[in-house]
């Protein structure tokens, strides 16, 4: 059966269900000090901007792909422009990661889109879905969670997700949609980089709010040497892309905009061999 995904107003509809953004699941990222500082205070102040929800021809996608600095696009698997958007981002020199749909604490699983990780799956089913998602997103070097406040606090499931990522040479970015997330501690025990989101840019759809969040992110990068932020295409896409473009120009010379892969390699020295299918390179 063909799955129908359309944009109605500001929300994706998947077989009649809504597909909200990760920030809608989280509301706020917990204020905590992350382990992103490398100790070399002479290094550039760096910011990695991850743009979620790419892969379904969403508002702001073209504008994000036209950004004149290196961004990271988190592409949802199995959607109408998954491969097109991932390839376009890669060809522009951006990093590509899998935006893995995961069950939230609140909301129906069918809101998530195809191939979602839900709490009723067996170990084998979790592994199979993660493998297939990686296979579906060309040039993916990592993964983060779409929504997932329920799953990222589940040690059984997240252990399997991280195992598959590690086996395939991918890192996992915790979007931090739940302050009880176990992703960071599991990553450390598995020898993987405990990288996570510091600030959501567009928890409210206004340029004023997004600018304020970008200012907070810039200050964090200046204070801590690095900052990881997440924005979205779709409902907030046009405002987010506009503010990102403004900020790139305004912060030039103060902050270097890098892909998340650059931070993972430089800060955590993560340099595994990617194991991708032959048609996904």
Which role does the model predict for each range below?
Residues 40-110:
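Active-site beta->alpha N-cap acidic-glycine motif
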Residues 165-178, 236-281:
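C-terminal domain-boundary segment and adjacent tail
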Residues 131-151, 222, 226, 230-232:
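Active-site groove signature of glycoside hydrolases
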Residues 11-49, 55-63, 265:
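N-terminal pre-catalytic segment of deacetylase/amide-hydrolase enzymes
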Residues 48-50, 54, 70-75, 113-122, ...:
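Second-shell loop/turn segments in exported
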Residues 111-112, 116-135, 152-157, 184-221:
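Alpha-helical scaffold elements lining the catalytic groove of polysaccharide deacetylases
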Residues 1-8:
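Sec-dependent signal peptide recognition
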Residues 47-52, 71-75, 94-100, 143-145, ...:
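Hydrophobic faces of well-ordered beta-strands that scaffold small-molecule active sites
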